């Protein structure tokens, strides 16, 4: 069996499997073919892969012969009947592409579709990458914000700590809370799930409560549609907190749908000049109407940084974690003898498969 690792297209810097993960496959007599230069942006050279037991090949050779092809985003290779594709393909949005691959005979696993269960945690790419996104969102905000994060008391005077508002207490939000607190800021958090209140408070942040939320506990960390009355109360509470915030980090997304607007233009107008918004939902429309994906815009004196791919700014660690998720998933579909076995009754195999 041959497992192929493709090089991602710029601006993506991650790679789906780093050199240290190769040995786990080669010891099962699985050949690992890596596209030349695939790991360079993640600080993993072709020589590193060769030393780990991989072979360096072209993308065409991988397309023509690999039984399993690993990537992060959708590959641009020709699809062969029977090939297994594994990545993070945004299957809920890219339905046409997934349908085309299925028609060409590919078996497609898009790992963001994995059920959010205890058994799936070791292969949960959403969580491993969101953890990085939450951490880097705060550092990005601190870099863009022209003031201190912590309180300072000096002979020249006192500086008040930055006020950070985090919308969404999923994996990214919780890491953002922890990082913002470490930097000395005052943190407020909003989430539609009252169940996360204890987690938020344990990290030292204030939880903004809004009664009447629809139960989102089973949504795998995503937002769910709420009632009109709740949305009205939500908008009012968020507007009040946003007007006092120096930094806002938004993380709210709904599977298969456009991200909800949580910060209106009127709210942005009410914010202090020099404030910063980091929108992690930019790729699905953004949590503000002014967000532009992969761009920084300044409106009404507020910087709005739209970036849903912050893990790519930490390519080495992000690739290591992503690759570990991939290896754990491969254990479900490759047996100890290195043979491909697709157990269609396995809830994780069935859940991750992207089909028409």
Where are the predicted features?
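A structured beta-alpha segment of the ubiquitous adenosine-cofactor-binding alpha/beta core
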Residues: 53-62, 74-75, 217-248, 252-269, ...
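Rossmann-fold NAD(P)-binding glycine/threonine-rich loop
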Residues: 92-118, 257-310
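Glycine/threonine-rich flexible loop motifs
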Residues: 12-16, 77-80, 87, 221, ...
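Short glycine-/small-residue-rich Rossmann-like dinucleotide-binding loops
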Residues: 73-74, 89-90, 253-255, 281-282
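Phosphate/diphosphate ligand-binding glycine-rich loop within oxidoreductases
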Residues: 68-143
């Amino acid at each position: 069996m041959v497992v192929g690792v493709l090089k991602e297209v710029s601006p993506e810097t991650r790679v789906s499997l780093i050199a240290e993960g190769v040995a786990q496959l080669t010891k099962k007599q699985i050949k690992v073919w890596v596209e030349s230069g695939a790991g360079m942006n993640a600080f993993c050279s072709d020589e590193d892969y060769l030393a780990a037991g991989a072979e360096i090949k072209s993308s065409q050779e991988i397309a023509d012969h690999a039984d399993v092809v690993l990537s992060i985003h959708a590959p641009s290779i020709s699809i062969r009947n029977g090939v297994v594709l594994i990545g993070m393909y945004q299957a809920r949005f890219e339905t046409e592409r997934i349908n085309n691959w299925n028609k060409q005979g590919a078996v497609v696993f898009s790992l963001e579709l994995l059920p959010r269960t205890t058994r799936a945690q070791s292969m949960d790419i959403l969580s491993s990458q969101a953890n990085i996104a939450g951490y880097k969102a705060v550092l990005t905000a601190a870099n863009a914000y022209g003031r201190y994060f912590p309180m300072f008391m000096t002979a020249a005077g006192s500086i008040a700590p930055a006020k950070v508002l985090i919308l969404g207490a999923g994996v990214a939000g919780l890491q953002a809370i922890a990082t913002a607190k470490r930097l000395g800021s005052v943190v407020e958090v909003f989430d539609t799930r009252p169940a996360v209140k204890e987690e938020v408070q344990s990290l030292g942040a204030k939880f903004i409560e809004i009664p009447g939320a629809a139960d989102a506990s089973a949504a795998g960390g995503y937002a769910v549609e709420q009632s009109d009355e709740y949305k009205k109360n939500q908008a009012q509470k968020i507007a009040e907190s946003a007007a006092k915030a120096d930094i806002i980090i938004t993380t709210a997304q709904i599977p298969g749908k456009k991200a909800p607007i949580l910060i209106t233009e009127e709210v942005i107008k009410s914010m202090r000049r020099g404030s910063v918004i980091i929108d992690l939902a930019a790729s699905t429309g953004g949590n503000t109407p002014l967000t532009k994906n992969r761009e920084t815009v300044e409106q009404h004196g507020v910087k709005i940084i739209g970036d849903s791919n912050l893990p790519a700014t930490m390519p080495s660690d992000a690739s290591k974690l992503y690759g570990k998720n991939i290896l754990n998933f491969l254990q479900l579909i490759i047996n100890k003898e290195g043979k491909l076995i697709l157990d269609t009754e396995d809830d994780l195999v069935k859940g991750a498969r992207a089909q028409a």
